[in-house]
């Protein structure tokens, strides 16, 4: 099915499904290139619904990096909601890209973001919807190469039968290495020949060149190389310096989970919380200079129309220049009614000076991440914060003019009891009580 036929069928399907804006494309700042003028065509598949996937920073970064190159194109695809999936299957319409409405089968590479393991089943469902064989050994040179990346692919073996390659580490540089190599492939080249060329790229794990070995109890033991030329060890790719951030991200037509402009200010973390995978694999810490952040905001705001900027990192209050940065934003964007969002702050790193700096901006809520509601459990996960520290911090936040505090908790920590779970509600009520005592019914 070509994209002309696909568009005709979509004209019949979309009026019948919930939130058709998930499936139309055409958003502000979307990039559409001439299909015939391109050397390598990539679909960026985020195996979640559009509402969630469009808020993923990694997708935004790769879309920007690939499309800056004149000979490559990147288009987006997401898994549909159940009504749209049913309609696609009934009409035999393959999963397609939003920009050009080409079936995913038409692309050279299917680049899949897998930030967490719960997306594995969505990923396989997306392959099936795209009419791409699920198992890699059932695919031919006529199918796109399926390359996955993201935090959950640091252990790629659970999905190894379904992929051609996995990126281990950060993707900004390796994606261009992959595309440059692919651009040198000859027409009709077999998949195995393509993978033989790609295996020379550092940070790329290609399962076909290895055989997993398991212990008697079924646990994983090691990998045995099936070809001598395969790397003995896959070295994690690390970007030494953060590349320029996207300053013209796509603005969705519909509500997404984060309706704001994203701007990464720091990558990595030194805290070492025992539950946190991202805090380990994204080391070392790299900070974006204040001047670069301010210059990006100068274009990001008019390019998107957003009035809220998310200063993103694993813990933005640990950014060493956070107070000078917020003060500089206050000064440069005074009178523009710009809100600053600092997601998921560590309680012990929230200072009075930071709250003083933030208090001059339009408030969008304050988010703290105790992660566990009892001191015993917080000590176990290496977040040694007392209940009193949390309550004192909450009081300071309320006193500085915030009415809403969001608390992040997780259920399922090792040694957790029902008392620990009940403490989530109890501690939340104590924080609310502090708010009522401090600012009254506005809390």
Give the location of each predicted region.
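Conserved SAM/AdoMet-binding glycine-rich loop
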Residues: 44-45, 298-406, 411-443
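N-terminal [4Fe-4S]-dependent radical SAM core
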Residues: 13-43, 50-51, 207, 214-262
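Iron-sulfur (Fe-S) cluster-binding segments and ferredoxin-like electron-carrier domains
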Residues: 276-292
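Helix-enriched interaction subdomains in cytosolic or periplasmic regions
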Residues: 1-19
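Low-complexity, highly charged intrinsically disordered N-terminal segments
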Residues: 42, 46-47, 53-88, 92, ...
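Flexible loop/turn segments at secondary-structure boundaries
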Residues: 50-53, 82-85, 118-120, 153-156, ...
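N-terminal pre-triad scaffold of radical SAM enzymes
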Residues: 44-48, 66, 250-277, 301, ...
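Glycine-rich beta-alpha loop elements in corrinoid/cobalamin-binding modules
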Residues: 79-225
């Amino acid at each position: 099915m070509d994209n002309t036929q696909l568009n005709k069928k979509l004209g019949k399907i979309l009026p019948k499904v919930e939130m058709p804006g998930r499936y139309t494309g055409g958003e502000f700042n979307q990039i559409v290139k001439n299909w015939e003028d391109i050397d390598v065509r990539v679909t960026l598949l985020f195996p979640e619904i559009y509402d969630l996937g469009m808020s993923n920073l990694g997708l935004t970064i790769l879309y920007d990096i690939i499309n800056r190159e004149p000979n490559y194109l990147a288009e987006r695809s997401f898994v549909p909601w159940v009504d749209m999936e049913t309609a696609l299957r009934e009409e035999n319409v393959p999963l397609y890209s939003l920009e050009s409405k080409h079936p995913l089968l038409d692309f050279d590479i299917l680049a899949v973001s897998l930030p967490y393991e719960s997306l594995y089943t969505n990923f396989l469902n997306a392959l099936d919807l795209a009419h791409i064989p699920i198992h890699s050994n059932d695919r031919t040179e006529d199918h796109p190469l399926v390359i996955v990346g993201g935090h959950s692919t640091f252990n790629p073996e659970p999905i190894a039968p379904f992929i051609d390659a996995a990126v281990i580490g950060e993707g900004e540089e390796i994606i261009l290495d992959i595309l440059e190599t692919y651009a040198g492939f000859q027409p009709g080249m077999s998949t195995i020949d393509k993978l033989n060329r790609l295996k020379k790229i550092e940070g790329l794990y290609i399962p076909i060149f290895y055989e997993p070995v398991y212990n008697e109890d079924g646990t994983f033991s090691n990998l045995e190389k099936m070809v001598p030329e395969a790397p003995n060890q896959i070295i994690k790719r690390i970007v030494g310096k953060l590349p320029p951030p996207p300053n013209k991200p796509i603005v969705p037509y519909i509500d997404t989970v984060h309706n704001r402009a994203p701007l990464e200010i720091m990558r990595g973390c030194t805290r070492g919380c025992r539950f946190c995978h991202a805090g380990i694999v994204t080391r070392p810490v790299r900070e974006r200079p204040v001047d670069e952040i301010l210059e990006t905001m100068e274009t990001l705001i008019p390019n998107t129309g957003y009035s809220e900027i998310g200063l993103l990192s694993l813990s933005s209050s640990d950014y060493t220049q956070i107070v000078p940065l917020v003060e500089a934003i206050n000064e440069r964007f005074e009178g523009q009614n710009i809100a600053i969002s600092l997601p998921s702050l560590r309680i012990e790193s929230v200072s009075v000076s930071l709250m003083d700096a933030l208090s001059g901006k339009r408030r969008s809520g304050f988010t703290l991440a105790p992660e566990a509601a009892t001191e015993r459990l917080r000590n176990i996960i290496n977040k040694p914060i007392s209940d009193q520290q949390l309550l004192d911090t909450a009081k300071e936040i309320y006193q500085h003019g915030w009415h809403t505090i969001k608390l992040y908790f997780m259920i399922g920590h090792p040694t957790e009891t029902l008392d620990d779970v009940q403490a989530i509600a109890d501690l939340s009520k104590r924080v609310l009580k502090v708010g009522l005592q401090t600012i009254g019914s506005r809390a």
